[in-house]
Design a protein with these regions (language model features):
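ATP-binding N-terminal substructure of ATP-dependent carboxylate-amine bond-forming enzymes
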Residues: 1-111, 142
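Short catalytic-loop micro-motif centered on adjacent basic/acidic residues
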Residues: 5-6, 83-86, 133-134, 170, ...
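Hydrophobic anchor at the start of a short beta-strand
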Residues: 31-33, 132-133, 155, 192
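Glycine-rich phosphate-binding loop signature in dinucleotide/nucleotide-binding domains
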Residues: 73-81, 149-151, 186-188
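A conserved helix-loop-beta module that forms one wall/lid of the active-site cleft
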Residues: 100-167, 174
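ATP-grasp fold ATP-binding core
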Residues: 125, 148-170, 188-200, 205-206, ...
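Short amphipathic alpha-helices within nucleic acid-binding modules
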Residues: 176-180
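ATP-dependent carboxylate/phosphate-activation module, predominantly the ATP-grasp catalytic core
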Residues: 196-199, 203-261
Length: 262
């Protein structure tokens, strides 16, 4: 029997779909504990009744509080936890800290930081021979304007550890960049990532990887691209899962996707 803790900071509908899928594995011998900062009543009763344990913490994004919460759940689940999981991207570094502290298998902090920090991720990808947009981690105005002159406009401005396309903007010239600097000034503790603007079709590559083996993957296309959606809120957008991904349009990502994970 496998004891799993699912970290669910907030009982959002999208997250609960994953929790509901996890509860189905109880028939296969899984025991499920849920760790959240929301009240138990925020979870639908039919779903909550399938939890083997539940623990609430003041802040489910804090590694120290999560660590204590996992220990509490372990006491309610036979004295051990075999896995700690969560689907929110901003949660991954904290979960990696919990696993390392408690000796639980799974992604460690270094690997989590590699994909959470987009500046670090691009440096690693480029070092491995995978092309990506030129970028600069911006902590002051001179760095920003220098990068703009070096790479040309437009530029993409975003947080280095964001999620989705939130707080992501396009600036078309130095005047717009100066305006961004006035409204959202970066600090050494809170830098901003600048990237050269690349246009084209945009895809995602999702993989199930176990101990370095890529067991399966899918490729989705954003229609239109996320940045275009953010700039034009009325657009009805979609994420398209193609039925056939064997053609030449997908050859490059078939090669680059596994290499990026390796």
């Amino acid at each position: 029997m496998t004891h799993v803790v699912f970290a669910v900071p907030f009982a959002m509908d999208a997250t609960l779909r994953f929790v509901e899928a996890a509860t189905r594995l109880r028939e296969e011998g899984l025991r499920l504990g849920v760790l959240s900062q929301d009240r138990p009543e925020r979870f639908p009763e039919a779903l909550r009744s399938r939890f083997d344990a539940f623990h609430r913490v003041p802040n489910a994004m804090d590694a120290d509080l999560l660590t204590d919460g996992v220990r509490q759940l372990a006491r309610s689940m036979g004295g051990r936890v075999d896995r700690v999981i969560g689907i929110l991207e901003p949660l991954q570094e904290a979960l990696a800290e919990v696993r390392e502290r408690l000796g639980i298998p799974g992604m460690r902090p270094e690997a989590a930081a590699n994909f959470r920090d987009k500046s670090r991720m691009k440096d690693l990808l480029r070092a491995s021979g995978l092309p990506c947009a030129r970028h600069r981690l911006w902590m002051g105005p001179e760095e920003a304007f220098g990068f703009g002159r070096e790479s040309g406009y437009p530029l993409v401005v975003k947080p280095p550890a964001g999620a989705g396309a939130r707080n992501t903007f396009r600036v078309d010239d130095e005047q717009e960049l100066a305006g961004y600097l006035r409204t959202m000034p970066p600090r050494p503790s809170d830098p901003v990532l600048l990237e050269e603007f690349l246009s084209g079709r945009e895809f995602s590559f999702d993989s199930v990887t176990l101990q370095g083996r890529h067991l399966l993957h899918s490729i989705n296309e954003y229609a239109p691209t996320p940045l275009e959606v953010m700039q034009t809120p009325w657009i009805q957008w979609a994420v398209v899962l193609p039925r056939d991904i064997s053609g030449p349009d997908y050859q490059a990502i078939h090669e680059a996707g596994p290499r990026a994970l390796d």
